[in-house]
């Protein structure tokens, strides 16, 4: 009503509204709102009033407050160990050491660990996930201590897979003692850390996409973006200012 003044809606009115959105909202929010009104225009048959969404430039840097570092990850693991939460400690190391999704923890079974390889089925795709020797030893020792002789290693007291929410809550409880920004601490960030470390060694994005189970390399690119700090250091080292 603010833009139509109780008069007919014109293309100019919609463009004015789009400009208002650009000045007051983030790009993704603007595009979401534009998609809604475009759908309404299609429903009403007002196709000539539709407007284009804003182009969203691919993110180049990861905000520092969101990137979990290797040192912070190590502190989280040590804190979990000090709190005698060995299950959480090993969940962190398993996700970060293999690059699997939280939902794929169910494939980390005693049988898979003994074999050093888990066969993961996710999103209509099957892939093999290798389990390195050191992680294998830790997981088998934990399973033996818990009396788990077969099947899933990470389970609740009732034998069900641990939910993402439970892992998230337990991870957040480590933040203060581990001195890690809570904004960085969520399960999927461990997968991102795996991706950055792997790419830093191999520089093979296609191979990394296969390991992570991505259908598109564009998704993998999002995982390996670093903070602006690293980019700034590289530019400083170029020494092109005379």
What label would you give each PLM region?
Residues 1-242:
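Conserved catalytic core of the tyrosine transesterase superfamily
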């Amino acid at each position: 009503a603010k833009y139509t003044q109780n008069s007919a809606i014109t293309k100019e009115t919609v463009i004015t509204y789009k400009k208002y959105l650009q000045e007051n909202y983030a790009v993704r929010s603007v595009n979401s709102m534009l998609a809604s009104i475009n759908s309404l225009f299609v429903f009403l048959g007002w196709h000539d009033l539709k407007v284009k969404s804003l182009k969203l430039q691919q993110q180049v840097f990861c905000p520092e407050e969101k990137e979990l570092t290797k040192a912070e990850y190590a502190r989280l693991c040590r804190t979990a160990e000090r709190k005698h939460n060995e299950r959480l400690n090993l969940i962190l190391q398993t996700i970060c050491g293999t690059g699997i999704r939280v939902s794929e923890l169910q494939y980390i079974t005693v049988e898979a660990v003994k074999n050093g390889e888990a066969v993961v089925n996710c999103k209509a795709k099957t892939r093999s996930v290798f389990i390195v020797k050191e992680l294998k030893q830790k997981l088998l020792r934990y399973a033996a201590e818990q009396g788990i002789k077969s099947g899933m290693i990470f389970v609740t007291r009732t034998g069900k897979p641990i939910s993402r929410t439970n892992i998230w809550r337990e991870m957040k409880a480590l933040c203060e003692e581990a001195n890690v920004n809570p904004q960085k601490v969520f399960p999927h960030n461990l997968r991102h850390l795996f991706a950055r470390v792997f790419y830093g060694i191999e520089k093979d994005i296609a191979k990394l996409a296969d390991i992570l189970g991505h259908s598109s390399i564009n998704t993998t690119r999002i995982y390996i973006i670093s903070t602006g700090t690293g980019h700034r250091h590289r530019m400083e080292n170029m020494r092109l200012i005379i």
